[in-house]
Amino acid sequence: MASEASDVRLPPGGPVVLPLVGIGTDIHAFEDGRELWCAGLKWEGEGPGLAGHSDADVVAHAACNALFSAAGLGDLGQHFGTGRPEWSGASGVTLLTEAARIVRAAGFTIGNVAVQVVGPRPKIGKRRDEAQKILSDAVGAPVSVSGATTDGLGFPGRDEGLMAVATALVVRAG
């Protein structure tokens, strides 16, 4: 019995170019004395910032991880880890811009990125359009941002930190 895959017919002129999908996550604990950066934006009056080697922007970092995952290019730590002092204190937008450059240099076109930040604050909806513009400009492709809470469960529910989960779609160029 033939498998369904063997019944697939390729269009004349060559193979179908399939998109590649990656997933990325990032988690940081809150730390007093730091500014809160999330989704490329500084959130004044939203409490302590996030601990990290860079600005600890979980949304930008998860987006980087998703792009690297989709392209098979490792992860955030490989490219911008704590062993790389030149990235110390870097903004998430700077890292995301560089991640997109690396992915394109490896021969990929970026389709889009979607990111969800998980935690009770900041309230992403208040500045969603602003965040999406900044992140889309950094990637050079559409980036959507959403927020979710955990109904008091886990470390985000206890207001100990933030988590973000992202997906990215890329296609091999040419």
Curated annotation (Swiss-Prot):
Binds 1 divalent metal cation per subunit. 4-CDP-2-C-methyl-D-erythritol 2-phosphate binds at D26, I27, H28, H53, S54, D75, L76, G77, F155, R158. A divalent metal cation binds at D26, H28, H61. It catalyses: 4-CDP-2-C-methyl-D-erythritol 2-phosphate = 2-C-methyl-D-erythritol 2,4-cyclic diphosphate + CMP. Keywords: Isoprene biosynthesis, Lyase, Metal-binding. Its EC number is 4.6.1.12. The keyword Metal-binding applies. It holds the Pfam family YgbB. Its cofactor is a divalent metal cation. It comes from the Bacteria. Coiled coil: none annotated. The keyword Lyase applies. One of its GO terms (biological process) is terpenoid biosynthetic process. GO terms for molecular function: 2-C-methyl-D-erythritol 2,4-cyclodiphosphate synthase activity; metal ion binding. SUPFAM superfamilies: IpsF-like. The record marks H53, T149 as: Transition state stabilizer. Pathway: Isoprenoid biosynthesis; isopentenyl diphosphate biosynthesis via DXP pathway; isopentenyl diphosphate from 1-deoxy-D-xylulose 5-phosphate: step 4/6. Belongs to the IspF family. Involved in the biosynthesis of isopentenyl diphosphate (IPP) and dimethylallyl diphosphate (DMAPP), two major building blocks of isoprenoid compounds. Catalyzes the conversion of 4-diphosphocytidyl-2-C-methyl-D-erythritol 2-phosphate (CDP-ME2P) to 2-C-methyl-D-erythritol 2,4-cyclodiphosphate (ME-CPP) with a corresponding release of cytidine 5-monophosphate (CMP). Homotrimer. This is 2-C-methyl-D-erythritol 2,4-cyclodiphosphate synthase.
